[in-house]
């Protein structure tokens, strides 16, 4: 850790409270229409129930959902927030906006520190509007907190404020265990940098040993958590299925290569990020602009190497580990890519603010327009469409079939059985299937006596025009390595289950449908208590 990197610590600590307040205010205004949405996907499936368990019992090991060994910092924060306020989606999402504002303040601090205030403001605006960051700003996931503490930790690292950096990296790892990769990458960089500068003899120097020893420290609180989790549950890294899905099933050379390609796309092109990265790449062909008789200052090469080490370490780690290749896992380093590109534009393009405005317009477009290939709805406002459809489906079931047994898949199985998630007032009896592809539904069709209606929905986003349809082998690869499947259409599912579609709705590629099983319909027709006016 050295100030020779080009960081300017004297300026970085000024005016950050107003930056945080302004960031939160603008985020709150932009996200106001989303604050009351019920909980979505992994929120509903794990993170909200885990935090709710902690609120009610004080125990960091959840009981209403499986423990997957994620560190408890975010759930502790939410439990305290609910205890001081209210347990509602709006309250929860406001709390997550505070975390997002903290992350943006860290982006501003870091960018102003290594570049200048103009680059800092532009980087913050681009980051806030980048679809993945925008969508994640109100969602109860761990990645935003990990990003916030990692970015602040990097800022202090570049100022050579070792203990502050170590503390923040430790908090990042307690927010999400994968965040430990940042201090590990910096530790390796501290060992390699002297070799590059002065040869192998420098590895044993006192400064190198001191920095390396301190950068191990963020792992200690995380290790203590894993030991505590193992003592309580018998598993160090979570339940066996969680470990299989995220570790043992991913250690295939071809899968690692394919995941690496997807991670590269996430870092340079995903959700219209290519508008910024391509613009910066083209700008590199231009000479630096001059301020007076001096060329505009670039981000110090040493700082760029630090950023590169952390970015590459994150991409490599997430190519090897993690069953779901989600863009939000890269939130701690995506702002670094944005910062490097914005700084390049400012240094070489005279009308760079207009280019940044074009980039922001592209990001807004990415929020509103889905890409022509399958993607995770949580990466833009498609998650809003999903939640609205599922809430309307739950309302329909409550009005028409309040006592029905419902065949469905996760996470709707949780949405219908846990009123605390915001979809229904009273729990339904649910029969769960893995998904709505042909094999699980064929198995369900052999025992239609166990359910009365089926709630089907798009478990995988399928655009009407899918670019990957031009590559049939790509779908086979996705099925083999990335848990991909195609859902049956509601009509095909109804024929297989022996029922009929009684309600269906669709929004921008997301759909939901209710199928009434003919056996249940016949029972109603012959029942003296049938109430045809129940709506």
Cite the ranges covered by each PLM segment.
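Signature aromatic-anchored transmembrane alpha helix within multi-pass, membrane-resident enzymes
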Residues: 20-21, 215-219, 273-279, 288-311, ...
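Membrane-lumen/periplasm interface segments of specific transmembrane helices
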Residues: 29-30, 183, 192-193, 207-281, ...
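Specific aromatic-rich, kink-prone transmembrane helix
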Residues: 104-106, 126-130, 145-164, 168, ...
């Amino acid at each position: 850790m050295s100030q020779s990197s080009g960081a300017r610590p004297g300026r970085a600590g000024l005016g950050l409270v107003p930056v945080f307040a302004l960031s939160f205010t603008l985020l709150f205004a932009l996200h106001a229409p989303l604050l009351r949405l019920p909980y979505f996907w992994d929120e509903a499936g794990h993170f909200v129930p885990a935090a709710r368990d902690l609120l009610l019992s004080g125990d960091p090991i959840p009981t209403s959902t499986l423990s997957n060994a994620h560190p408890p910092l975010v759930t502790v924060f939410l439990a305290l927030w609910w205890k001081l306020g209210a347990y509602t989606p709006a309250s929860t999402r406001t709390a997550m906006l505070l975390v997002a504002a903290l992350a943006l303040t860290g982006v501003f601090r870091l960018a102003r520190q290594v570049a200048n205030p103009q680059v800092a403001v532009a980087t913050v605006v681009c980051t806030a509007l980048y679809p993945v960051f925008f969508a994640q700003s109100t969602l109860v996931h761990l990645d935003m907190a990990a990003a916030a503490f990692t970015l602040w930790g990097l800022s202090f690292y570049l100022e050579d404020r070792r203990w502050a950096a170590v503390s923040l990296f430790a908090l990042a790892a307690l927010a999400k265990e994968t965040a430990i990769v940042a201090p590990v990458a910096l530790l390796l960089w501290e060992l390699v940098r002297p070799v590059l500068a002065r040869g192998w003899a420098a590895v044993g120097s006192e400064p190198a040993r001191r920095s390396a020893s301190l950068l191990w420290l963020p792992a200690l609180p995380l290790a203590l958590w894993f030991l505590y989790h193992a003592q309580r549950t018998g598993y160090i890294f979570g339940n066996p299925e969680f470990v299989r899905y995220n570790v043992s099933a991913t250690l295939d050379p071809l899968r690692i290569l394919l995941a690496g390609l997807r991670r590269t796309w996430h870092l340079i092109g995903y959700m219209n990020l290519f508008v910024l990265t391509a613009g910066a790449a083209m700008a590199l062909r231009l000479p630096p602009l001059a301020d007076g008789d001096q060329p505009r200052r670039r981000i110090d090469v040493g700082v760029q190497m630090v950023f590169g080490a952390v970015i590459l370490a994150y991409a490599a780690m997430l190519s090897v580990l993690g069953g779901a290749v989600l863009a939000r896992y890269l939130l701690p380093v995506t702002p670094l890519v944005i910062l490097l590109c914005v700084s390049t534009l400012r240094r070489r393009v005279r009308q760079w603010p207009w280019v940044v405005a074009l980039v922001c317009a592209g990001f807004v477009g990415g929020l509103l327009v889905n890409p022509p290939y399958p993607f995770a709805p949580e990466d833009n406002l498609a998650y809003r469409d999903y939640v609205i459809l599922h809430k309307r489906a739950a309302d329909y079931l409550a009005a028409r079939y309040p006592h029905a047994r419902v065949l469905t898949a996760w996470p709707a199985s949780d949405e219908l059985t846990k009123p605390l998630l915001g979809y229904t007032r009273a729990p339904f009896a649910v029969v769960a299937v893995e998904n709505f592809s042909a094999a699980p539904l064929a198995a369900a069709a052999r025992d239609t006596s166990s359910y009365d209606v089926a709630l089907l929905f798009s478990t995988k986003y399928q655009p009407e025009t899918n670019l990957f349809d031009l590559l049939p082998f790509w779908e086979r690869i996705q099925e083999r390595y990335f848990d991909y499947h195609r859902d049956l259409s509601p009509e095909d599912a109804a024929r297989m289950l022996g029922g009929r579609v009684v309600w269906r709705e669709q929004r921008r590629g997301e759909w939901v449908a209710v199928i009434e099983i003919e056996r249940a319909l016949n029972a109603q027709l012959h029942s003296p208590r049938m109430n045809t006016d129940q709506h």
